[in-house]
Regions:
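Hydrophobic alpha-helical transmembrane segments of multi-pass integral membrane proteins
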Residues: 1-183
Length: 183
């Protein structure tokens, strides 16, 4: 893992970025003026505020932070622990990009619609319904992309576990295993 071009480093980097965004989001949403505004628009029990807190905040931390980290760690450790090469580098890359795009799309969809509908709730409530018309398809698209990333991950792990073990010489050390184990 000495090289920054390691195929799994992107999982770690985006996990850290996601935790930073989620932490900043969490700190901002408890500041009294922001918390008051969120409470007036329905957070955390419904309404536009619910999109910002807890939906956007939780998904950034859980999917962007924890899930991407867990996926990267699994891809790193599985060859070492099982003696099997990760079945597909393409599926590994698809796992990362689909999960990342889905999670960030979901986050920004929740934030964008939450803020827009929250502002409209106080100034022009009649504009919420036409705006909300686009919310369902947008969040469904992002969720589907995220789910496709999860599916690629599960398929790749299953194919790896069902494959034949590689000779132990291929999995020499913790440092070299992922490089030699990812095709």
């Amino acid at each position: 893992m000495a090289s920054s071009s390691h195929p799994l480093i992107k999982f770690l980097v985006l996990s850290v970025v996601s935790f930073c965004i989620g932490t900043l989001h969490g700190m901002l949403q408890v500041m009294p003026p922001i918390r008051h505004w969120l409470d007036t628009i329905g957070s955390p029990y419904g309404g536009p505020g619910h999109m910002i807190d807890p939906l956007a905040h939780a998904h950034m931390n859980l999917v962007g932070g924890v899930v991407l980290l867990a996926m990267g760690v699994t891809y790193y450790l599985l060859p070492i622990l099982s003696g099997r090469a990760i079945r597909s580098r393409r599926l590994t890359n698809a796992t990362f990009w689909l999960t990342a795009l889905g999670a960030y799309g979901f986050y920004f969809t929740q934030m964008g619609f939450g803020i827009a509908e929250g502002l409209a709730l106080h100034s022009a409530p009649e504009t919420i319904a036409p705006l909300h018309h686009y919310y369902g398809p947008t969040v469904a698209l992002c969720g589907t992309v995220m789910a496709a990333g999860f599916f690629c991950y599960l398929v790749n792990i299953a194919l790896t576990l069902l494959s034949r073990p590689v000779p132990r010489a291929v999995v020499l050390s913790v440092r070299e295993a992922p490089k030699s184990a990812l095709r």
